[in-house]
Amino acid sequence: MANNTGSDSKNTLYCSFCGKSQHEVRKLIAGPTVFICDECVELCMDIIREETKSTGLKSADGVPTPREICKVLDDYVIGQMHAKRVLSVAVHNHYKRLNHSSKTDIELSKSNILLIGPTGCGKTLLAQTLARILDVPFTMADATTLTEAGYVGEDVENIILKLLQASEYNVERVQRGIVYIDEVDKITRKSDNPSITRDVSGEGVQQALLKIMEGTVASVPPQGGRKHPQQEFLQVDTTNILFICGGAFAGLEKIIAQRGKGSGIGFGAEVKDPDARGVGELFKELEPEDLPKFGLIPEFVGRLPVIATLTDLDEAALVTILTEPKNALVKQYQRLFEIEGVKLTFTADALTAIAKRAIKRKTGARGLRSIMEDILLDTMFELPGLEGVEEVVVNEEAVNSGAKPLLIYTEVTKKKDATAS
């Protein structure tokens, strides 16, 4: 409420928000029993502007276009153009479907996504970046920890609970969220033969996931844990939640290559050696019928109509990942050293050597951080206790032979050392 008393006059008016008098501001806008000054209006505008900016890209109908989505993905994920295009179109269509569902009699079905690619090629990062662009609740689940309801392990409904927690229990927002299920290749059917024992972490989990992926009203205990009769449940409709499943699918390339062997017939036919092509190249030839042979049940494959395959990251792509994205590893370590007042430099040869080590380890982009930690560990340990260090240079020898990075001292320190000697 505005204060009606002032130091110079009883009629002086004050801003109800910051308390400044009408003489201290340019304008004071009156409302029913309240006043707001021009400075507070400006502040409110800034807050609204920031909030609007943080909600990500929005086109005329509230959904970013596929090109806009792909452009933002390019800032964070290097390469994988085909996968980015597939994801951009699928996500755009999914949220366009939600925004226009009541405007027509034609019911548009949901298109969940399956990402297939080698370890460290960017599957998880793609899903995380999508959620950031769209400003929707996002959660990740590890398929290896899931079991059928009633067995030791996590129920599939715990995934929805995590999504609820990510949205601070806003059920309406949850029902437009994104769930990324990692390691989905680890819940494949253990055997083609019927077994006396129940497969609770393989086919059983696939069966349990079918319902929430297709769309059901899940009863989720608000505080987590096991369900009990006296507990109140939150009802969450999963019909409009977008599910993205990802996995390395090691061994799937052999099934694809085996299927392709029959195509080379006759004396002039070209028969390619499967080993001559990379895993990512073989994944490009994937057909939906290859997945049941790998161990996914046909009903589960049917719930994932959009399939995007990712390729192996080559040496050039790994060097780009180290230096170019917004959160590039080199930029992160340079910032750490900058806090100590030291410049960190990597030579071109050093970056190439790091990329080669990651390829040799077969860990993709995921292995880059551990390699960087190994190289810089001793330097980061000693640096806070050293005086006069101006720059740290990581060269090829530091990567390949375990030599310490070069330390460059300031001129003042050099002169002091010369005087002391």
Swiss-Prot record:
Q: List the disulfide bonds.
A: none
According to the UniProt record, one GO cellular component term is: HslUV protease complex
Positions bound to ATP: 118-125
Q: Name the keywords, alphabetized.
A: ATP-binding, Chaperone, Metal-binding, Nucleotide-binding, Zinc
Which positions make up the signal peptide?
Answer: none
In this chain, Zn(2+) is annotated as bound at 15, 18, 37, 40
The residues that cross the membrane are: none
Top-rank taxon: Bacteria
Q: Where is the ClpX-type ZB domain?
A: 3-56
MF terms from GO for this chain are: ATP binding; ATP hydrolysis activity; ATP-dependent protein folding chaperone; protein dimerization activity; unfolded protein binding; zinc ion binding
Any one of the GO BP annotations: proteolysis involved in protein catabolic process
Q: Which Pfam families match?
A: AAA_2 (PF07724), ClpB_D2-small (PF10431), zf-C4_ClpX (PF06689)
**Family assignment from sequence similarity:** Belongs to the ClpX chaperone family.
What is the annotated role of this protein in its UniProt record?
A: ATP-dependent specificity component of the Clp protease. It directs the protease to specific substrates. Can perform chaperone functions in the absence of ClpP.
Assembly notes? Component of the ClpX-ClpP complex. Forms a hexameric ring that, in the presence of ATP, binds to fourteen ClpP subunits assembled into a disk-like structure with a central cavity, resembling the structure of eukaryotic proteasomes.
Q: NCBIfam families given for it?
A: clpX (TIGR00382), PRK05342.1 (NF003745)
Q: What is this protein called?
A: ATP-dependent Clp protease ATP-binding subunit ClpX
Gene (name only)? clpX
